[in-house]
Curated annotation (Swiss-Prot):
Catalytic activity: (4R,5S)-dethiobiotin + (sulfur carrier)-SH + 2 reduced [2Fe-2S]-[ferredoxin] + 2 S-adenosyl-L-methionine = (sulfur carrier)-H + biotin + 2 5'-deoxyadenosine + 2 L-methionine + 2 oxidized [2Fe-2S]-[ferredoxin]
Native source species: Chlorobaculum parvum (strain DSM 263 / NCIMB 8327) (Chlorobium vibrioforme subsp. thiosulfatophilum)
Residues that hold [4Fe-4S] cluster according to the record: 73, 77, 80
UniProt keyword annotations, A-Z: 2Fe-2S, 4Fe-4S, Biotin biosynthesis, Iron, Iron-sulfur, Metal-binding, S-adenosyl-L-methionine, Transferase
Protein name, per record: Biotin synthase
Domain of life: Bacteria
EC supergroup of this enzyme: transferase
EC annotation from Swiss-Prot or TrEMBL: 2.8.1.6
Classification of source organism: Bacteria, Pseudomonadati, Chlorobiota, Chlorobiia, Chlorobiales
Gene designation per UniProt: bioB
CDD domains found in the cross-reference section: Radical_SAM
Ligand binding ([2Fe-2S] cluster): 152, 213, 283
């Protein structure tokens, strides 16, 4: 090992050699690295990704979502345009009809998307309601009409009965994020519900055999060490997919004036996440195009092996053809 590497990065090379996650102690030390050392850390994270999480066919995991029910959410998430507690401008509509879901899913699938997520605003579903039954019908329709498409969902917090029904209807992944270090959820994200309600949902889903997609947001006011706390909380939950979002400040939300996190700090976060989760799918989600801009490829080399394409819930995404080209370019570094 070259003596020019920072000693903590040298120690972290054990992840590459063994496939074992970095320790919390070492991750915390890596979080304190100066910005001048970040590219060496990125290089290690890319090597770990290529060896232990190379992606589908050696490529990039890509998924798309549809905002199937928008706005008037009773939760007070500080980053979210859809909360009725915030004054952001956002489209408001109830659950769309299944034909609209099928049309959008088919269009995305024809462009090469393999995973499609149905997303709804609101707390979630403690019980199976008529609206929830409509969502189950959408899932069944997509399975019938697009059998090669993996159908996913993000419907908020769930009771046991709705979780069991999603398993019975063959959902591929369920997204529910813890967003930040659990100890700071109430302060940084929301206090109309607790992070424990999210964690309980994750455990219910896993008990029914559903793979969970769970990650967080960079830029809510958390420290680097608190980001690492979130990363290690995800280890304990043993989730399958980890989406990392970079905050896109939205006018009319409490975080509209949030200070941006530096590119090296974000890259460091992605790299540490990869070293803590050597074989997981780590997806770069919101903020890829609007915040990272010219540096989004750097995060794909800092350990990410997937991204959300085709747009987000209330912000626009990038052209899917451009994303296909990006995926091809990233693959050349494998």
């Amino acid at each position: 090992m070259s003596s020019r590497l920072h000693p903590d990065i040298e120690r972290a090379y054990r992840v590459l050699e063994t496939g074992e996650p970095v320790s919390l102690e070492l991750a915390s030390a890596l979080g304190r690295l100066p910005e001048s050392e970040v590219l060496d850390l990125v290089s290690l994270a890319n090597k770990v990704k290529n060896l232990y999480a190379p992606g589908e066919g050696g490529g990039v995991h890509a998924c798309s979502i549809m905002n199937a029910k928008s706005g008037v959410c009773g939760e007070n998430c500080r980053f979210c345009a859809q909360s009725k507690h915030n004054s952001a401008e956002v489209d408001v509509y109830g659950l769309v009809d299944e034909a609209k879901v099928l049309d959008q899913a088919r269009a995305l699938h024809e462009q090469g998307v393999g995973h499609f997520g149905i997303v709804t605003s609101g707390y979630g579903y403690r019980k199976v309601t008529p609206e929830f039954e409509r969502i189950l019908g959408m899932i069944d329709l997509l399975h019938r009409e697009l059998p090669d498409l993996k159908v996913c969902a993000s419907l908020g917090m769930l009771g046991d009965e709705p979780a069991a029904e999603l398993a019975r209807h063959g959902i591929a992944h369920y997204n529910i994020n813890i967003q930040v270090d659990p100890g700071r959820y109430g302060e940084l994200i929301a206090d109309t519900h607790s992070v424990d309600e999210r964690i309980d949902t994750i455990r219910r889903l896993r008990a029914h055999g559903i793979a969970v997609c769970c990650g967080g947001i960079i830029g809510t006011g958390e420290t680097m060490q608190e980001r690492i706390g979130m990363i290690f909380a995800l280890q304990k939950l043993d989730v399958t997919v980890i989406p990392l979002n970079v905050l896109v400040p939205i006018d009319g939300t409490p975080l509209e004036g949030a200070a941006p996190v530096s590119v090296p700090e974000i890259a460091k976060t992605f790299a540490i996440c990869r070293l803590a989760h050597p074989s997981k799918i780590i997806k770069f989600a919101a903020g890829r195009e609007t915040v990272m801009k010219d540096f989004q490829g750097l995060l794909m080399l800092a350990g990410a092996n997937g991204f959300l394409t085709g747009g987000y819930l209330t912000t626009r995404g990038r052209d899917m053809e451009a994303d296909r080209q990006l995926a091809g370019q990233i693959a050349r570094f494998s």
